[in-house]
Amino acid sequence: MIWHVQNENFILDSTRIFMKAFHLLLFHGSFIFPECILIFGLILLLMIDSTSDQKDIPWLYFISSTSLVMSITALLFRWREEPMISFSGNFQTNNFNEIFQFLILLCSTLCIPLSVEYIECTEMAITEFLLFVLTATLGGMFLCGANDLITIFVAPESFSLCSYLLSGYTKRDVRSNEATTKYLLMGGASSSILVHGFSWLYGSSGGEIELQEIVNGLINTQMYNSPGISIALISITVGIGFKLSPAPSHQWTPDVYEGSPTPVVAFLSVTSKVAASASATRIFDIPFYFSSNEWHLLLEILAILSMILGNLIAITQTSMKRMLAYSSIGQIGYVIIGIIVGDSNDGYASMITYMLFYISMNLGTFARIVSFGLRTGTDNIRDYAGLYTKDPFLALSSALCLLSLGGLPPLAGFFGKLHLFWCGWQAGLYFLVSIGLLTSVVSIYYYLKIIKLLMTGRNQEITPHVRNYRRSLLRSNNSIELSMIVCVIASTIPGISMNPIIAIAQDTLF
Protein backbone atom coordinates (compact mmCIF):
# COMPACT_ATOMS: atom_id res chain seq x y z
CA MET A 1 0.00 0.00 0.00
CA ILE A 2 2.79 2.42 0.96
CA TRP A 3 4.70 1.49 -2.21
CA HIS A 4 1.56 2.13 -4.27
CA VAL A 5 1.12 5.62 -2.76
CA GLN A 6 4.80 6.44 -3.28
CA ASN A 7 4.57 5.27 -6.87
CA GLU A 8 1.54 7.50 -7.50
CA ASN A 9 3.35 10.49 -5.95
CA PHE A 10 6.36 9.82 -8.15
CA ILE A 11 4.17 9.74 -11.26
CA LEU A 12 2.42 12.97 -10.24
CA ASP A 13 5.74 14.72 -9.55
CA SER A 14 7.17 13.53 -12.86
CA THR A 15 4.07 14.74 -14.68
CA ARG A 16 4.31 18.18 -13.06
CA ILE A 17 7.99 18.46 -14.01
CA PHE A 18 7.24 17.39 -17.58
CA MET A 19 4.35 19.84 -17.89
CA LYS A 20 6.49 22.65 -16.51
CA ALA A 21 9.26 21.85 -19.00
CA PHE A 22 6.71 21.67 -21.82
CA HIS A 23 5.24 25.01 -20.72
CA LEU A 24 8.71 26.62 -20.76
CA LEU A 25 9.49 25.18 -24.18
CA LEU A 26 6.12 26.26 -25.57
CA PHE A 27 6.42 29.87 -24.44
CA HIS A 28 10.20 30.29 -24.78
CA GLY A 29 10.96 27.92 -27.65
CA SER A 30 11.01 30.72 -30.21
CA PHE A 31 14.02 32.22 -28.42
CA ILE A 32 16.04 29.04 -29.02
CA PHE A 33 14.57 28.13 -32.42
CA PRO A 34 18.03 27.69 -34.08
CA GLU A 35 19.02 25.35 -31.25
CA CYS A 36 15.73 23.45 -31.61
CA ILE A 37 16.56 22.82 -35.27
CA LEU A 38 19.83 21.17 -34.25
CA ILE A 39 18.06 19.09 -31.61
CA PHE A 40 15.58 17.90 -34.25
CA GLY A 41 18.52 17.06 -36.53
CA LEU A 42 20.12 15.01 -33.75
CA ILE A 43 16.91 13.04 -33.20
CA LEU A 44 16.55 12.45 -36.94
CA LEU A 45 20.15 11.17 -37.16
CA LEU A 46 19.48 8.64 -34.40
CA MET A 47 16.26 7.46 -36.02
CA ILE A 48 17.84 6.99 -39.46
CA ASP A 49 20.89 5.22 -38.04
CA SER A 50 18.76 2.76 -36.08
CA THR A 51 16.54 1.88 -39.04
CA SER A 52 18.85 2.09 -42.07
CA ASP A 53 21.76 0.32 -43.74
CA GLN A 54 25.02 1.46 -45.31
CA LYS A 55 23.24 2.79 -48.41
CA ASP A 56 21.73 5.63 -46.37
CA ILE A 57 25.07 7.06 -45.22
CA PRO A 58 24.86 10.11 -47.56
CA TRP A 59 21.59 11.00 -45.83
CA LEU A 60 23.44 11.35 -42.53
CA TYR A 61 25.74 14.00 -43.99
CA PHE A 62 22.81 15.68 -45.71
CA ILE A 63 20.73 15.89 -42.52
CA SER A 64 23.66 17.21 -40.48
CA SER A 65 24.59 19.87 -43.01
CA THR A 66 20.96 20.83 -43.65
CA SER A 67 20.19 21.27 -39.95
CA LEU A 68 23.23 23.52 -39.59
CA VAL A 69 22.30 25.61 -42.64
CA MET A 70 18.70 25.90 -41.45
CA SER A 71 19.91 26.99 -38.03
CA ILE A 72 22.07 29.69 -39.65
CA THR A 73 19.05 30.83 -41.69
CA ALA A 74 16.90 31.03 -38.54
CA LEU A 75 19.57 33.18 -36.90
CA LEU A 76 19.72 35.54 -39.87
CA PHE A 77 15.94 35.97 -39.91
CA ARG A 78 16.05 36.84 -36.21
CA TRP A 79 18.72 39.49 -36.75
CA ARG A 80 18.12 42.97 -35.29
CA GLU A 81 15.29 41.85 -33.01
CA GLU A 82 15.07 43.37 -29.55
CA PRO A 83 17.21 41.71 -26.83
CA MET A 84 15.18 39.22 -24.82
CA ILE A 85 15.79 37.17 -21.67
CA SER A 86 14.03 33.79 -21.53
CA PHE A 87 13.82 30.61 -19.46
CA SER A 88 13.54 32.52 -16.16
CA GLY A 89 16.71 34.50 -16.83
CA ASN A 90 18.90 31.56 -17.90
CA PHE A 91 19.24 32.55 -21.55
CA GLN A 92 19.67 35.89 -23.29
CA THR A 93 19.03 36.56 -26.96
CA ASN A 94 20.68 39.59 -28.58
CA ASN A 95 22.75 40.43 -31.64
CA PHE A 96 26.02 40.11 -29.74
CA ASN A 97 25.32 36.51 -28.74
CA GLU A 98 23.85 35.62 -32.11
CA ILE A 99 26.89 36.61 -34.13
CA PHE A 100 29.03 34.26 -32.03
CA GLN A 101 26.42 31.54 -32.55
CA PHE A 102 26.62 32.26 -36.27
CA LEU A 103 30.40 31.81 -36.19
CA ILE A 104 30.08 28.47 -34.38
CA LEU A 105 27.49 27.23 -36.86
CA LEU A 106 29.69 28.38 -39.74
CA CYS A 107 32.64 26.41 -38.33
CA SER A 108 30.56 23.24 -38.01
CA THR A 109 29.06 23.65 -41.48
CA LEU A 110 32.53 23.86 -43.04
CA CYS A 111 33.96 21.03 -40.92
CA ILE A 112 31.42 18.38 -41.96
CA PRO A 113 32.38 18.31 -45.69
CA LEU A 114 35.98 18.47 -44.50
CA SER A 115 35.43 15.17 -42.67
CA VAL A 116 33.62 13.09 -45.31
CA GLU A 117 36.62 11.61 -47.12
CA TYR A 118 38.61 11.23 -43.89
CA ILE A 119 35.82 9.19 -42.27
CA GLU A 120 35.48 6.97 -45.34
CA CYS A 121 39.21 6.32 -45.60
CA THR A 122 39.75 5.64 -41.89
CA GLU A 123 36.46 3.70 -41.54
CA MET A 124 35.38 5.67 -38.50
CA ALA A 125 31.83 5.38 -37.15
CA ILE A 126 29.90 8.07 -39.01
CA THR A 127 26.74 8.55 -36.99
CA GLU A 128 28.48 8.99 -33.66
CA PHE A 129 30.95 11.44 -35.19
CA LEU A 130 28.15 13.63 -36.56
CA LEU A 131 26.19 13.36 -33.31
CA PHE A 132 29.17 14.56 -31.29
CA VAL A 133 29.83 17.45 -33.69
CA LEU A 134 26.21 18.63 -33.58
CA THR A 135 25.98 18.22 -29.79
CA ALA A 136 29.20 20.18 -29.30
CA THR A 137 27.82 22.87 -31.62
CA LEU A 138 24.64 22.94 -29.55
CA GLY A 139 26.64 23.33 -26.34
CA GLY A 140 28.65 26.17 -27.85
CA MET A 141 25.49 27.97 -28.96
CA PHE A 142 23.92 27.71 -25.51
CA LEU A 143 27.16 28.99 -23.99
CA CYS A 144 27.02 32.09 -26.20
CA GLY A 145 23.56 32.96 -24.88
CA ALA A 146 24.07 31.81 -21.28
CA ASN A 147 22.98 34.41 -18.74
CA ASP A 148 23.53 32.65 -15.41
CA LEU A 149 26.34 30.73 -13.72
CA ILE A 150 24.68 27.32 -13.98
CA THR A 151 24.13 27.56 -17.74
CA ILE A 152 27.63 28.98 -18.21
CA PHE A 153 28.97 25.83 -16.53
CA VAL A 154 26.66 23.19 -18.05
CA ALA A 155 26.86 24.44 -21.67
CA PRO A 156 30.67 24.26 -21.99
CA GLU A 157 30.64 20.88 -20.25
CA SER A 158 28.36 19.61 -23.01
CA PHE A 159 30.85 20.96 -25.53
CA SER A 160 33.84 19.58 -23.61
CA LEU A 161 32.47 16.05 -23.19
CA CYS A 162 31.90 15.79 -26.94
CA SER A 163 35.39 17.22 -27.52
CA TYR A 164 36.97 14.54 -25.32
CA LEU A 165 35.12 11.80 -27.21
CA LEU A 166 36.01 13.25 -30.60
CA SER A 167 39.70 13.67 -29.76
CA GLY A 168 39.92 9.97 -28.84
CA TYR A 169 37.79 8.78 -31.73
CA THR A 170 40.57 6.72 -33.31
CA LYS A 171 40.83 4.27 -30.43
CA ARG A 172 43.62 2.19 -31.97
CA ASP A 173 45.94 5.20 -32.24
CA VAL A 174 48.23 5.47 -29.20
CA ARG A 175 48.75 9.21 -29.76
CA SER A 176 45.01 9.77 -29.83
CA ASN A 177 44.55 7.93 -26.53
CA GLU A 178 47.36 9.92 -24.93
CA ALA A 179 45.91 13.20 -26.19
CA THR A 180 42.44 12.33 -24.90
CA THR A 181 43.76 11.41 -21.46
CA LYS A 182 45.61 14.72 -21.10
CA TYR A 183 42.66 16.66 -22.49
CA LEU A 184 40.20 14.96 -20.12
CA LEU A 185 42.33 15.37 -16.99
CA MET A 186 43.16 19.01 -17.63
CA GLY A 187 39.58 19.73 -18.69
CA GLY A 188 38.23 18.24 -15.47
CA ALA A 189 40.70 20.22 -13.38
CA SER A 190 39.86 23.49 -15.16
CA SER A 191 36.12 22.88 -14.74
CA SER A 192 36.53 22.39 -11.00
CA ILE A 193 38.54 25.61 -10.75
CA LEU A 194 35.85 27.42 -12.76
CA VAL A 195 33.12 26.18 -10.39
CA HIS A 196 35.25 27.29 -7.44
CA GLY A 197 35.31 30.81 -8.90
CA PHE A 198 31.56 30.71 -9.47
CA SER A 199 31.00 29.72 -5.83
CA TRP A 200 32.87 32.84 -4.67
CA LEU A 201 30.74 35.00 -6.97
CA TYR A 202 27.57 33.30 -5.76
CA GLY A 203 28.42 33.78 -2.10
CA SER A 204 29.73 37.33 -2.41
CA SER A 205 26.60 38.50 -4.28
CA GLY A 206 24.22 37.10 -1.68
CA GLY A 207 23.16 34.01 -3.59
CA GLU A 208 22.59 35.43 -7.09
CA ILE A 209 23.33 33.42 -10.24
CA GLU A 210 22.19 35.72 -13.09
CA LEU A 211 25.01 37.91 -14.39
CA GLN A 212 23.33 41.29 -13.97
CA GLU A 213 21.79 40.28 -10.63
CA ILE A 214 25.28 39.36 -9.41
CA VAL A 215 26.35 42.97 -10.00
CA ASN A 216 23.33 44.25 -8.07
CA GLY A 217 24.02 41.75 -5.31
CA LEU A 218 27.65 42.83 -5.01
CA ILE A 219 26.50 46.44 -4.65
CA ASN A 220 23.98 45.49 -1.95
CA THR A 221 26.47 43.40 0.01
CA GLN A 222 29.33 45.87 -0.54
CA MET A 223 31.55 42.93 -1.57
CA TYR A 224 32.61 44.17 -5.01
CA ASN A 225 36.13 45.02 -3.81
CA SER A 226 36.53 42.08 -1.41
CA PRO A 227 39.33 39.47 -1.56
CA GLY A 228 36.69 36.90 -2.51
CA ILE A 229 36.08 38.68 -5.81
CA SER A 230 39.82 38.56 -6.55
CA ILE A 231 39.83 34.81 -5.89
CA ALA A 232 36.78 34.42 -8.13
CA LEU A 233 38.45 36.45 -10.88
CA ILE A 234 41.63 34.36 -10.83
CA SER A 235 39.74 31.05 -10.71
CA ILE A 236 37.38 31.97 -13.54
CA THR A 237 40.28 33.27 -15.65
CA VAL A 238 42.06 29.92 -15.21
CA GLY A 239 38.88 28.00 -16.08
CA ILE A 240 38.12 30.01 -19.20
CA GLY A 241 41.82 30.01 -20.08
CA PHE A 242 41.67 26.25 -20.63
CA LYS A 243 39.03 26.73 -23.33
CA LEU A 244 40.86 29.63 -24.98
CA SER A 245 44.26 27.89 -24.52
CA PRO A 246 46.44 30.97 -24.04
CA ALA A 247 49.83 30.52 -22.38
CA PRO A 248 50.35 29.18 -19.74
CA SER A 249 47.08 27.18 -20.07
CA HIS A 250 48.20 25.76 -23.40
CA GLN A 251 49.93 22.52 -22.36
CA TRP A 252 47.16 20.29 -23.69
CA THR A 253 46.90 22.01 -27.07
CA PRO A 254 49.94 20.64 -29.00
CA ASP A 255 49.34 17.03 -27.91
CA VAL A 256 45.61 17.14 -28.69
CA TYR A 257 46.27 18.76 -32.08
CA GLU A 258 48.87 16.13 -32.98
CA GLY A 259 47.06 13.04 -31.68
CA SER A 260 43.44 13.72 -32.60
CA PRO A 261 41.90 13.06 -36.04
CA THR A 262 42.61 16.05 -38.26
CA PRO A 263 38.94 17.01 -38.94
CA VAL A 264 38.36 16.95 -35.18
CA VAL A 265 41.33 19.27 -34.66
CA ALA A 266 39.97 21.61 -37.32
CA PHE A 267 36.61 21.68 -35.52
CA LEU A 268 38.04 22.20 -32.04
CA SER A 269 40.63 24.77 -33.11
CA VAL A 270 37.96 27.32 -33.99
CA THR A 271 34.68 26.45 -32.23
CA SER A 272 36.19 26.23 -28.74
CA LYS A 273 37.82 29.63 -29.12
CA VAL A 274 34.70 31.30 -30.49
CA ALA A 275 32.49 29.93 -27.70
CA ALA A 276 35.02 30.72 -24.96
CA SER A 277 35.54 34.26 -26.31
CA ALA A 278 31.78 34.91 -26.25
CA SER A 279 31.57 33.67 -22.67
CA ALA A 280 34.68 35.61 -21.57
CA THR A 281 33.39 38.94 -22.87
CA ARG A 282 30.17 38.63 -20.88
CA ILE A 283 31.69 37.25 -17.68
CA PHE A 284 34.48 39.80 -17.47
CA ASP A 285 32.39 42.74 -18.60
CA ILE A 286 29.33 42.21 -16.36
CA PRO A 287 30.06 40.50 -12.99
CA PHE A 288 33.61 41.90 -12.83
CA TYR A 289 32.60 45.41 -13.86
CA PHE A 290 34.11 46.81 -10.64
CA SER A 291 37.38 44.91 -11.16
CA SER A 292 38.08 46.02 -14.73
CA ASN A 293 41.65 47.12 -13.97
CA GLU A 294 42.46 43.75 -12.41
CA TRP A 295 41.08 41.57 -15.21
CA HIS A 296 42.58 43.86 -17.84
CA LEU A 297 45.99 43.27 -16.25
CA LEU A 298 45.44 39.51 -16.07
CA LEU A 299 44.42 39.29 -19.72
CA GLU A 300 47.30 41.52 -20.83
CA ILE A 301 49.74 39.12 -19.18
CA LEU A 302 48.07 36.14 -20.86
CA ALA A 303 48.07 37.90 -24.24
CA ILE A 304 51.77 38.78 -24.03
CA LEU A 305 52.76 35.26 -22.96
CA SER A 306 50.60 33.73 -25.69
CA MET A 307 51.92 35.90 -28.51
CA ILE A 308 55.56 35.43 -27.53
CA LEU A 309 55.61 31.74 -26.56
CA GLY A 310 53.17 30.61 -29.24
CA ASN A 311 55.02 32.18 -32.15
CA LEU A 312 58.55 31.44 -30.93
CA ILE A 313 57.90 27.75 -30.21
CA ALA A 314 56.04 27.36 -33.52
CA ILE A 315 59.32 28.04 -35.35
CA THR A 316 60.90 24.87 -33.94
CA GLN A 317 58.07 22.46 -34.82
CA THR A 318 58.43 19.73 -37.43
CA SER A 319 54.80 18.55 -37.37
CA MET A 320 52.31 20.66 -39.28
CA LYS A 321 49.57 20.13 -36.71
CA ARG A 322 51.84 20.98 -33.76
CA MET A 323 52.96 24.11 -35.61
CA LEU A 324 49.34 25.17 -36.03
CA ALA A 325 48.72 24.40 -32.35
CA TYR A 326 51.37 26.89 -31.25
CA SER A 327 50.25 29.30 -33.97
CA SER A 328 46.71 29.18 -32.52
CA ILE A 329 48.13 30.04 -29.09
CA GLY A 330 49.68 33.15 -30.62
CA GLN A 331 46.47 33.95 -32.49
CA ILE A 332 44.39 33.87 -29.30
CA GLY A 333 46.75 36.49 -27.89
CA TYR A 334 45.61 38.83 -30.67
CA VAL A 335 41.95 38.04 -29.92
CA ILE A 336 42.47 38.88 -26.24
CA ILE A 337 43.41 42.42 -27.30
CA GLY A 338 39.86 42.86 -28.59
CA ILE A 339 38.41 41.49 -25.33
CA ILE A 340 40.48 43.96 -23.30
CA VAL A 341 39.50 46.94 -25.45
CA GLY A 342 35.83 45.92 -25.15
CA ASP A 343 33.00 48.22 -26.11
CA SER A 344 35.21 51.28 -26.34
CA ASN A 345 37.08 51.91 -29.58
CA ASP A 346 35.26 49.09 -31.40
CA GLY A 347 37.22 46.39 -29.57
CA TYR A 348 34.51 43.75 -29.83
CA ALA A 349 33.83 44.61 -33.47
CA SER A 350 37.50 44.16 -34.37
CA MET A 351 37.68 40.91 -32.39
CA ILE A 352 34.60 39.47 -34.14
CA THR A 353 35.93 40.51 -37.56
CA TYR A 354 39.32 38.93 -36.91
CA MET A 355 37.72 35.72 -35.62
CA LEU A 356 35.66 35.46 -38.81
CA PHE A 357 38.85 35.69 -40.87
CA TYR A 358 40.68 33.34 -38.50
CA ILE A 359 38.00 30.68 -39.03
CA SER A 360 38.50 30.77 -42.79
CA MET A 361 42.30 30.89 -42.60
CA ASN A 362 42.58 28.07 -40.08
CA LEU A 363 40.01 25.74 -41.64
CA GLY A 364 41.52 26.32 -45.08
CA THR A 365 44.92 25.24 -43.74
CA PHE A 366 43.45 22.17 -42.05
CA ALA A 367 41.63 21.22 -45.27
CA ARG A 368 45.02 21.02 -46.93
CA ILE A 369 46.41 18.90 -44.07
CA VAL A 370 43.46 16.49 -44.34
CA SER A 371 43.83 16.18 -48.11
CA PHE A 372 47.62 15.73 -48.04
CA GLY A 373 47.55 13.40 -45.03
CA LEU A 374 45.03 11.02 -46.63
CA ARG A 375 47.26 10.64 -49.69
CA THR A 376 50.64 10.41 -47.96
CA GLY A 377 50.01 9.41 -44.34
CA THR A 378 52.23 12.17 -42.95
CA ASP A 379 51.95 15.67 -41.53
CA ASN A 380 55.67 16.35 -41.27
CA ILE A 381 56.51 19.79 -42.61
CA ARG A 382 59.53 18.55 -44.59
CA ASP A 383 57.36 16.03 -46.44
CA TYR A 384 55.42 18.85 -48.13
CA ALA A 385 58.45 19.79 -50.23
CA GLY A 386 57.58 20.01 -53.92
CA LEU A 387 53.81 19.65 -53.54
CA TYR A 388 53.27 22.34 -56.19
CA THR A 389 54.64 20.00 -58.87
CA LYS A 390 51.95 17.39 -58.11
CA ASP A 391 48.94 19.42 -56.95
CA PRO A 392 49.19 23.14 -57.79
CA PHE A 393 45.68 23.89 -56.51
CA LEU A 394 46.38 22.42 -53.09
CA ALA A 395 49.77 24.16 -52.84
CA LEU A 396 48.43 27.58 -53.89
CA SER A 397 45.43 27.30 -51.57
CA SER A 398 47.73 26.41 -48.70
CA ALA A 399 50.04 29.30 -49.47
CA LEU A 400 47.19 31.83 -49.51
CA CYS A 401 45.78 30.63 -46.18
CA LEU A 402 49.23 30.64 -44.55
CA LEU A 403 50.04 34.11 -45.86
CA SER A 404 46.71 35.34 -44.54
CA LEU A 405 47.44 33.79 -41.13
CA GLY A 406 50.75 35.63 -41.14
CA GLY A 407 48.98 38.90 -41.89
CA LEU A 408 50.51 39.85 -45.23
CA PRO A 409 48.65 42.40 -47.41
CA PRO A 410 46.34 42.45 -49.27
CA LEU A 411 44.85 39.32 -47.68
CA ALA A 412 42.05 39.27 -45.11
CA GLY A 413 44.35 38.42 -42.22
CA PHE A 414 46.30 41.64 -42.74
CA PHE A 415 43.24 43.88 -42.54
CA GLY A 416 41.83 41.92 -39.60
CA LYS A 417 45.05 42.34 -37.62
CA LEU A 418 45.42 45.95 -38.71
CA HIS A 419 41.98 46.89 -37.39
CA LEU A 420 42.48 44.90 -34.19
CA PHE A 421 45.86 46.49 -33.47
CA TRP A 422 44.56 49.96 -34.35
CA CYS A 423 41.71 49.60 -31.85
CA GLY A 424 44.21 48.45 -29.22
CA TRP A 425 46.48 51.40 -29.97
CA GLN A 426 43.58 53.86 -29.65
CA ALA A 427 42.71 52.31 -26.28
CA GLY A 428 46.24 52.97 -25.01
CA LEU A 429 47.53 49.39 -25.18
CA TYR A 430 50.79 50.49 -26.76
CA PHE A 431 53.03 47.79 -25.30
CA LEU A 432 50.55 45.02 -26.07
CA VAL A 433 50.11 46.15 -29.68
CA SER A 434 53.89 46.47 -30.11
CA ILE A 435 54.34 42.88 -28.94
CA GLY A 436 51.59 41.84 -31.35
CA LEU A 437 53.30 43.52 -34.29
CA LEU A 438 56.69 41.97 -33.48
CA THR A 439 55.30 38.47 -33.03
CA SER A 440 53.32 38.82 -36.27
CA VAL A 441 56.62 39.39 -38.06
CA VAL A 442 58.01 36.26 -36.38
CA SER A 443 54.99 34.24 -37.52
CA ILE A 444 55.53 35.33 -41.12
CA TYR A 445 58.94 33.61 -41.00
CA TYR A 446 57.66 30.11 -40.26
CA TYR A 447 54.71 30.48 -42.62
CA LEU A 448 57.02 31.54 -45.46
CA LYS A 449 59.33 28.62 -44.65
CA ILE A 450 56.45 26.21 -45.32
CA ILE A 451 55.43 28.05 -48.50
CA LYS A 452 59.01 27.80 -49.78
CA LEU A 453 58.88 24.02 -49.31
CA LEU A 454 55.53 23.79 -51.07
CA MET A 455 56.73 25.68 -54.12
CA THR A 456 60.15 24.09 -54.57
CA GLY A 457 60.64 22.46 -57.97
CA ARG A 458 64.11 20.97 -57.62
CA ASN A 459 64.02 17.17 -57.89
CA GLN A 460 66.57 16.60 -55.15
CA GLU A 461 64.34 18.44 -52.65
CA ILE A 462 61.06 16.72 -53.55
CA THR A 463 60.26 14.11 -50.91
CA PRO A 464 59.22 10.51 -51.66
CA HIS A 465 55.79 11.29 -50.19
CA VAL A 466 55.20 13.93 -52.86
CA ARG A 467 56.69 11.77 -55.65
CA ASN A 468 54.17 9.04 -54.80
CA TYR A 469 51.36 11.56 -54.29
CA ARG A 470 48.04 10.55 -55.84
CA ARG A 471 45.51 13.18 -56.87
CA SER A 472 42.59 11.41 -55.19
CA LEU A 473 42.16 8.24 -53.18
CA LEU A 474 38.43 8.02 -53.79
CA ARG A 475 36.22 8.75 -56.77
CA SER A 476 36.04 12.38 -55.78
CA ASN A 477 37.34 14.68 -53.11
CA ASN A 478 34.88 17.45 -53.89
CA SER A 479 33.79 17.80 -50.26
CA ILE A 480 37.27 18.79 -49.06
CA GLU A 481 37.79 21.03 -52.07
CA LEU A 482 34.45 22.72 -51.41
CA SER A 483 35.45 23.66 -47.87
CA MET A 484 38.89 24.69 -49.07
CA ILE A 485 37.57 26.95 -51.84
CA VAL A 486 35.16 28.71 -49.46
CA CYS A 487 37.92 29.22 -46.90
CA VAL A 488 40.47 30.44 -49.46
CA ILE A 489 38.02 32.97 -50.90
CA ALA A 490 37.20 34.25 -47.41
CA SER A 491 40.91 34.39 -46.52
CA THR A 492 41.79 36.49 -49.56
CA ILE A 493 38.99 39.05 -49.33
CA PRO A 494 40.51 42.46 -50.12
CA GLY A 495 40.22 45.43 -47.80
CA ILE A 496 37.21 46.79 -49.67
CA SER A 497 35.02 44.25 -47.84
CA MET A 498 36.21 45.28 -44.38
CA ASN A 499 33.84 48.21 -43.89
CA PRO A 500 30.55 46.28 -44.26
CA ILE A 501 31.88 43.43 -42.09
CA ILE A 502 32.96 45.82 -39.33
CA ALA A 503 29.67 47.72 -39.61
CA ILE A 504 27.76 44.48 -39.01
CA ALA A 505 30.04 43.60 -36.11
CA GLN A 506 29.52 47.03 -34.53
CA ASP A 507 25.77 46.31 -34.38
CA THR A 508 26.43 43.36 -32.08
CA LEU A 509 27.45 45.36 -29.01
CA PHE A 510 25.46 44.95 -25.84
Swiss-Prot record:
Residues passing through the membrane, by range: 24-44, 57-77, 99-119, 124-144, 183-203, 227-247, 295-315, 323-343, 347-367, 395-415, 418-438, 484-504
Main location: plastid
GO molecular function terms attached to this record: NADH dehydrogenase (ubiquinone) activity; quinone binding
The organism's place on the tree of life at top rank: Eukaryota
Record localization: Plastid, Chloroplast thylakoid membrane
Example GO BP: photosynthesis, light reaction
Keywords assigned by UniProt, alphabetized: Chloroplast, Membrane, NAD, NADP, Plastid, Plastoquinone, Quinone, Thylakoid, Translocase, Transmembrane, Transmembrane helix, Transport
GO cellular component annotations of the record: chloroplast thylakoid membrane
Membrane topology designation: Multi-pass membrane protein
EC number(s) reported in the record: 7.1.1.-
Catalysed reactions listed for this entry: a plastoquinone + NADH + (n+1) H(+)(in) = a plastoquinol + NAD(+) + n H(+)(out); a plastoquinone + NADPH + (n+1) H(+)(in) = a plastoquinol + NADP(+) + n H(+)(out)
HAMAP family: NDH1_NuoN_1
Family: Belongs to the complex I subunit 2 family.
NCBIfam families recorded: NDH_I_N, PRK02504.1
Function: NDH shuttles electrons from NAD(P)H:plastoquinone, via FMN and iron-sulfur (Fe-S) centers, to quinones in the photosynthetic chain and possibly in a chloroplast respiratory chain. The immediate electron acceptor for the enzyme in this species is believed to be plastoquinone. Couples the redox reaction to proton translocation, and thus conserves the redox energy in a proton gradient.
Known partners and oligomeric status: NDH is composed of at least 16 different subunits, 5 of which are encoded in the nucleus.
Protein name: NAD(P)H-quinone oxidoreductase subunit 2 A, chloroplastic
Gene source species: Calycanthus floridus var. glaucus (Eastern sweetshrub)
Name of the coding gene: ndhB1
